[in-house]
Amino acid sequence: MKNIFLHSLSLENYRNFKNLELKTDNTPIILIGENGSGKTNILEAISLFYPGRGLRSAKLADICKTSEDHCLVKALLQSKLGLAEFTTQFKRSSNRRITEYNESKIANNELSKFTSMVWLTPHMEGIFTSSSSDRRKFLDRIVYNFDPKHTELVSKYEYYMHERNKILVEDIRDDNWLKIIEEKMADISNHIANNRLKTLEFMQHAIDDLENEFPKADLSIDGIVEQKILNGEENIVSFITAELYQTRNNDKLLGRTSFGVHKSDFLVKHQKKNILAKFCSTGEQKAILIAIILAEMNYAIKLTKIAPILLLDEVFVHLDDKRRQYLIEFFTGLNMQLWVTTTNLEGIENFATKAQLIKL
């Protein structure tokens, strides 16, 4: 098994940190400190070395320390391709983020070629009652760990969708280019939908097979394209192309694309109660979310033979002793780099003896 882990992390003008240097090993790491000390900021900085905008989905300007014109995050990381230096930096003057791998610029969506990462934060506990967009992004992030190429597909799809919207709204008379764009969107949509369905199948097996202290969930996706694939229908790409053509006039008025895989919703049910997670109690929702993360970790490692970095922000808070102990044993048993934030060590004293403690 190949482990993804940080050897060192350096922050400059990042959120509340002027400068911070951390040296780490492939062991559990506990960040301990008062609220506001910057524990979550460190996790967020690490998460920037995975496709997307990090675990907070923050605006670029927000990650830069107030009154500073730039910020920099540097990491020496054991990646899928070996030891490498990664940097990501932002300058207010350009309002752009630049990411580099061994001093060569790379696109954000290329990061999944090098890293694998999973995180769980208090903000995610409301994912079942939030927007379908949040749930869809959560599912796609899971897919990235199974299929790194999925990142590029989603990025390309969003690019072509933006181009289509622009042509329609600005009334650009170029039917040939519009036809090409819609054909590309249709082809990419088919791949995205199949990747999601394949991952959900893997995940469902993992949930059903893994006996733990958390409720089992039934996973599905509510989307027209995905449903047609599940029904065994043929000519999916032609169907999508036709739908995009037929909705042009309506989408021109709306200013957006009303049909496609960007409208699909990730649905989660409490298996035993047979009700959607959004109708469960907040405690049950947190437990179901943890169960999904456990399944993702377990199956991703089995399938890819790669152990990702795991970021847990205040996860042990409000868990009973039995579930807390199960999580500790599960994660330490995987022999991976685990980052945990907490305000105190109450309830995790034994775990702390096996971890690197960083006090903020």
From Swiss-Prot:
Keywords: ATP-binding, Cytoplasm, DNA damage, DNA repair, DNA replication, DNA-binding, Nucleotide-binding, SOS response. Pfam families: SMC_N. GO terms for biological process: DNA replication; DNA synthesis involved in DNA repair; double-strand break repair; SOS response. The keyword DNA damage applies. It comes from the Bacteria. GO terms for molecular function: ATP binding; single-stranded DNA binding. One of its GO terms (cellular component) is cytoplasm. It is found in: Cytoplasm. Gene3D superfamilies: P-loop containing nucleotide triphosphate hydrolases, RecF/RecN/SMC, N-terminal domain. ATP binds at residues 33-40. Belongs to the RecF family. The RecF protein is involved in DNA metabolism; it is required for DNA replication and normal SOS inducibility. RecF binds preferentially to single-stranded, linear DNA. It also seems to bind ATP. NCBIfam families: recf. This is DNA replication and repair protein RecF. The lineage of its organism: Bacteria, Pseudomonadati, Pseudomonadota, Alphaproteobacteria, Rickettsiales. The gene is recF.
